[in-house]
Amino acid sequence: IDEHASRLLCRFPDNGPVPYYQSNYYTWPDGKTEHRDFPAEFRDKRVWWDNELIIGWAAEVPLDKYNRTVMLYWQRTGDPSLYLYEQIQISDDGQNRCRTWHWIRNGLLETRTAIQEKFVTKDWLAVDKEMGNKI
């Protein structure tokens, strides 16, 4: 079992190289840290990623009349045998979301990931400044 803290910073810049830019910051109890960036494009009512780590998309689920569900698919760039489907559930007040990942290798379930998140702020510019980020 891998348990760690994460902070996701999702940006929608008015000007910049891409319309969506996500940075993930991970911290493990032993002090290990990791930072990954995921720039993305919008097209066909989806967010699309294509970078050195993943190729994939995220989209709202139109069958959900409550607009609580987003589905995501991605494949590891260097490993075509491994792909992932993620279901994201957003609370009605927009303050929480839970995510479930199914990692599939060669058509078989390899592992599951469960994530509980809490919304912090819409002011991603202030967070970027606080963290010293530049995109």
Show which residues each predicted segment covers.
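Soluble ligand-binding/transfer domains with enclosed cavities or grooves
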Residues: 1-135
